Amino acid sequence: MKQPNKAPRADRAAPKGTATPKRHKKTRVELDIEARERKRQKRHSGNRSGARTNIEGSNKTGSTQAQEKDPRIGSKVPVPLVVESKAKAKLTTKPVAKVEAKPRLTPEEELTKLENDERLDALLDRLDNDEVLSKEDQAYVDLTLDRIDALMEQLGIELGDDEDDEEREEKPEDILKLLKSGNPKDTF
């Protein structure tokens, strides 16, 4: 028994009136022509020369739109070259920060404080041991010792070094006496 041919189903077949044409393969000449056109379009895809630095050229198309302000251009506010009296008045009206006055130490208190300074003692010990101090440490020692000398003069305190000077002054007198007396060996 022969069965009749089945008709194609609607979901498998293309809709009526639209036939799928066969794709015909392009020839080498057609491919070359298309490639040349793509290459020509690709050449012109970038910006013109100098487009990065010439902003005016790119704004020609946007002249109908509101032009954006160039951020590289500074303020047009004039800068005063001469100081006016109004500016001085503003400066004087600023509130001055109150500086708390440190309680002044009496010279005796300051002298005892400087004499008991641990940092100064350590630096003087290093100097006695023939060590070289840094510039900051040497400056600190010099300033502190100068202040101690000034305070001692203010208070009328004399150092024991002056006694050594008096002994040195007495020795030349003794030498003169010995020379005048005649034989220096007799006096010993």
From Swiss-Prot:
Residues 28-37 have a biased composition (Basic and acidic residues). Pfam families: YihI. InterPro entries: YihI. Belongs to the YihI family. This is Der GTPase-activating protein YihI. Residues 159-168 have a biased composition (Acidic residues). GO terms for biological process: ribosome biogenesis. The keyword Ion transport does not apply. One of its GO terms (molecular function) is GTPase activator activity.
